[in-house]
Amino acid sequence: MKRMKFLKALSVVLFGSYGLGAEPAPHPLVLVSEGKLPIILSAPHGGDQAIPGVAERKGDALERGPGKFVTARDTGTEELAIALADAIEKRMGKRPYLVVAKFHRKYADANRPAELAFEDPKAKPAYEAYHTALAQYCRAVQKNYGRGLLLDLHGQVAATDTIFRGTQNGKTVTLLTQRFGPAAQNGPKSFFGLLETAGCKVYPRDESREKSSFTGGHIVMTYGSHTVHAIDAIQCEFGTEYRVREKVKDTATKVATAVEEFAKLYLLEDKKH
């Protein structure tokens, strides 16, 4: 109890700039939806809209590539996040929290620290609205449930039939493994183990290290359970086959199946919500 009070107080001190009030302030280019489960869905790279008056980022002097300077959108992840929220509600009777960037990544990148996320100050409000919502929702989940799961949804083309896990090799799910042991991170009843059972091809399948390009970025590193937010956070990199329009609903159904089972095992025990 003392640790939880300390974490809450510290989160206000460290993340007060993200506005930890009851409701995120609305922004036309950030879709937010309050949930009734200890589950948060994030999709920072699926948007296709311009930020008015903002030029495309150039990335001068920045290294390019996965985890570095990128302007391509993760096609289909906006639609996947919304479909997944619907599928979770259908299975569990309640909706998860949802934060989706509708602005295109070439104007601002919500999965980078602010100093690397945008070049035009006029893009800052959209970026901050995204993180305000995530910070507030993490705080709400921590307050109401004491534990939670943040799934940060991305797309990749390195392996079109695979979903890559990104937790900084377990760092962003520190509390999960402390509570339930390493099998909760890499065993058959881990989230990715449950994804595999649901019919998805995943990597890593066991205790192997995560693929170097997809180990988890700014969002999971900012809100993961190794931080004051105390929410287990997993970056999910979906191959193209999972994100094409005709497959999004099927993908959402499979992922929702894994989410429901994971929640029963690790999130909702002895809870009255």
Locate each region found by the language model.
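Bacterial Sec-dependent signal peptides at the C-terminal "C-region" and cleavage site
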Residues: 10-25
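N-terminal export leaders
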Residues: 3-7
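N-terminal catalytic or cofactor-binding beta/alpha core of small enzyme domains
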Residues: 23-272
